[in-house]
Amino acid sequence: MSALPPEHRDAARMLAVEAAWARAGAGRLVLLRGATGTGRTTVLEGAVADAQAHGMRVLRARCSPRDQGVPYATVLQLMAPVPEFGEAAFAGDDRVGAALFRRVLHSYADRAPLLIAVDDVHLADPASHRWLVESARHVDRLRILLVATERSQYDVDPPAPGLTHTLSPALVRTLTLAPLTPNSAAELVRSAHADASASWVDDCVRAGAGNPLLLRALLDDLGAGRHPTVPTTSAALYPGAYPAAVSWWLDSAGPGTGEVARALAALDEGWDGDAPRELPNGVTRPDTACPSDELASLIAELAGADPARVAGWLTAMTGLGVLRPDLDGRPRYAHPLLRDAVLTGVPATRRRAAHAAAAETMHRHGVSPDTVARQLLLSDPVGEPWTSAALQEAASLALRDGRTDDAAAFLRRTLREPLTDAHRQRLLTELGSLEYKAHATSAGIPRLSEALRLPGAPQDTVRAAVALGTALAGRGRTVAAVDVLRTVEDELTDRPQLIRTLQTASVLLSEQDPSVRTEVYRWLCDAAERAPELIGTAGHALVVRHEATAGLISAAEAMGRLRALLAQPADPQTEPFLIGTAAAVAQWADELPEAERLVESGLVGQRPDLLHPMHEALANVRADILAARGEHARLLAEPWARDPARTTPSNREAHVLLSLVATGEEARAVRFAESLDLRSAPDSWELNRFLYARGVARAATGDTAGALHDFLECGRRQSAREVVSPIVTPWRTAAAECRLALGRPHEAIALAEEELGLARVWNTPRTVGRSLRVLAEATGGRRGLELAEEAVRLLRGAPEGTETELVSALIAQGRGLTAAGDRGRARACLREAAERAERLGAARQWALAEEALGESGARRTASARTGSRSLTSSERRIAELAADGRTNTEIADLLHLARRTVETHLTSSYRKLGIHRRGELSGVLGRAGGK
């Protein structure tokens, strides 16, 4: 008995007690009930063995559907071992036969206690069924224990009356076998696979569905170590005991139940991936659930069954463990393998048809588009208008929730439906844009090319052309991108607004290739002089941008012209270019609040399913704003800063490098730079930004010669593009610092003076202050000190976001004062620099200020008092765990600390970091993940 699961042991003990009473002359009918596969036969065999061990004779029969047409087939099985029966003549009359069987049975039982064991009595022929019922009325004073097993399971088809339907409860003892509990099932799995992992055991338990038959069949198929993970399809199982057991389980339930079970399995397939496990912050789960009452009606309609019976079956199967409710409350199969086994043998065409029928029925019932669309993903084309509408609505909802993979899948499925060319063009443009952004497939550009070849509305054709041009330029094919836009431009001679859109996009995309850029900007500037009305406000904004980078205008003039352009009536097609260009120039002009407002306004107008060059441009400006403010920790916390898929340098990688250096991770910055492949990088402005950033990282780690090479190469490339202003990459002052470190001050002074001249043209505190500071370091002496003091004065009155430059200027002034022997003033400057750097979290600047303080003769501080560098190792560890979303209790358990200790450390960390809420931790700790 110890080998039996607990659910069987209780029944076996009860049967043993009843057998003892029968041996004492108090017979009874015991009905052992249970669902298919719950072990009725196993328990009955145990009772037979126990009875024989106690000297009881045993008569047994196993009923079968084949016996239904043979009168007394079950009784004849029982009587076969009885010697007296062989001598009796059976005339075939029911009443005579029944009396004869009872007489022979009583005679046989007089000699010794008797156990009559009938398995699957619900399958007995009608005559035997009546005889067993009548016999049960007369065994209470005989030494006979009549034990019958009966299937007791809720089926869609109403069952026939059971054995005890007409018997008094006093004559019957009913035992019901419950399904296996998760613990009992896990014990059975571990008894066969002692070394199995917890997840493997859990998969087996769920696939076994609380059913001993299914669980043992599964364990037979899994064998000894053949499957490191539990499969999700029956095809992976050998020899196939599990799917055979599931098939038998379904057959036992009848055709109606089988149809309902398969209909639910088809629906269940469509629910896979219904919603992501984690959604972006602030996004709620989509309304994908089908209400339970509607689900029963839906399945009933698909299977041609009674909705009330279907609802009861769903409830019963959930109780047995075959089904489990998901997070939306829908009953689903306990494991994908069980669901697949239910569908085994169903042809693929029938399954696809079932999904189509399910989708149509759901649509008619008003189920959410997402749920309908997931059924359509598994169906053949339907050809009805509602199909494409439901799929597109589901795609829109997925995009709203940030589930771009789902949106792309829905759009792919939509394209399989019959569509007009114009409709297909729009969908191909959206899908191609999503696939290009995903980087997981190369289908994006071919789809966009196909979209452009289809006839459609002019504005849709322009959208397709801009999307294709953006994709081509992003892959380094700038010439092809501009050619695409020009080709479409030639076809739209009567649409001046759309032509301006294409021309503006050509100008922006040309930034990715120096030769194309020169040609396009020459045309743009000529057009601005000859026919300014032709290029529109966005074109004029690009002219302002070009003049700014060429060092031809001041920041004040640039912003004045751009604000005037922004005040003019907007062209919806070109407005994104105007806003994005104005945002970039505002950031260069240190008008950071205005730049930030423009970025947010521009991003609101961008569609996630439509490639547009301004989307990437606006994202770059947002990163530039964070860097300008010295918010390096926030930059490193951005999702793109931790994206391991990016292997070529870009503006974002440049910001990661600069932020790592600023936060004291110089060695890590160099390793990151070396991990990127510059050979495959397009010859674009982004490569130049990266070369500058790599130079900063090399200089910070002592590779001055390597840094100088990067700065000069950056300058050569920028000059070739007519980008001479230091507003983008101040390579001259960076190279000057390297020249100075290499002992070539005259060359350093020349570079610094050249940049100062260009900086005074742009005339913002950041650019002028930086040039003055480097020129001061290169010049030295009294003149150098005067230049450093001028830089500090200028930067003290600068707009917000220039504090990192002020810190550098204070360090330069402090070093100059130390060299001049004015150590008191030097220490004051350097202490201010250290305090400002500490508040900013600028670890490298703080270290430089501390080093300069030491050179001035001041006592070095032991450590930072605020900022992320001030955290102790314990505080940082706890803060990082909290930033990852762990609760105080979880942190305490993980680190074996008291919860109060965790709370104390977090309170101290908040104070040092200058924050007030747990949600701010990830932004200030400044981790770049894999990078």
Q: At which residue positions do the language-model features occur?
A:
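Short secondary-structure boundary elements
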Residues: 38, 184-409, 413
